[in-house]
Amino acid sequence: MNLRTGIWLGTAALLLAAGPAGASGLADWDLKPASVELGGWAASLGGTANLTGYRANEDAGAGRTGGTASLFLDPEVSRLLANGWRVGAMGVINAYHDQLSGDNYGNDVFQKSYLFVATPYGRVEFGQQDGAAYKMAMTGPLVADAIAIDDANITFYRDPTTGEAFTNVFAVRSGVFATKNDAKLSYYTPRLLGVQLGVSYTPHMVKDGLPFISAGPHIADRQDNLVDAAINYTGFFGRTSLGLYAGLSAGHNAARTPGHDDLFDWALGGELDYDLGEATLALGGAWHQSNGYTLDPSDAFAHGTTHVVHASTKLTAGSWLFGLEYSTGTADAEAALPKLDTTGYEASVGYRINSNLQLTAGWQHLRFTRDSGVFYNGLPRANMEAGFLYLRFHV
């Protein structure tokens, strides 16, 4: 870490330390989504705004100070029936994002749009939504999800040759994300004795709002008839709470080319929380493996795998959160594709100003290597680090 990064991080730490005093007028905030009822139907609109300032350093380049932002809207319409069932529709609209944030679903404005039925016998979802193997994932505690290394929705490093986020070369993720927000049908059981089951069926890897409408483009090695299955468990034992997760996604290669195969993607994870009295300590992690190169379901090979390991810990004391995160991943070489390795570390401190606002400061270091070819910097390796100050507003 160089001097300029140290200065930036020191400034961020001072701002974070001033948070409680400066936020005294905000401490009583408890904003709820805007809502209205009409003819037995209830409609609401919530959302999340992310704003991040950072100082990043990369190989073969000068340090760079910048900012990134994103805005999501969460509309919902539902009706409670006389039998206690609730029916409705939900969505997530990516109202704004730049090239470094909010892009986990591939630039979709309408990231999610689905119908649901919630009953005492379980919940059914029908439409453009996460699959069961991702939605039920437990992969370790985080101070702030969006800026974590694992499943990052905000990054600080740009490939100057493309203008896109450099981390897209191998985006590590420890939950099974193979069916993304493709149109699907899902069912989740009620939780019984701490156990919940989930299953999803995705006919085709397309985003047409509802499944079975379109088969999508007929491209080579496309996966059809994908099935997600997941199980998780939550239990409490005195001062200890335990969460465990297993998920998988399997598909059929409908246009197989030599060397490619059906998709098989699976993960195991968990988290252990212990109540210390004045604070809570959480530990967790996950293992994720897929035959999709760099976890890409459209590039599933017959031999070789990609795997990701994630470990994290978090200490929560009142409104303060302290976290450490470690992630590593390897994508085996395939045909003309190089072997890729990535390792990352992150330390962060968060302060919950109120139920709507959280301020987080931190530092992360990432390293990427390849066994053939070079990255944009002309080297087979890329080292990068960043200090950041992140504000999340959620209603």
Positions of PLM-derived features:
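Outer membrane beta-barrel
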Residues: 32-51, 62-207, 233-236
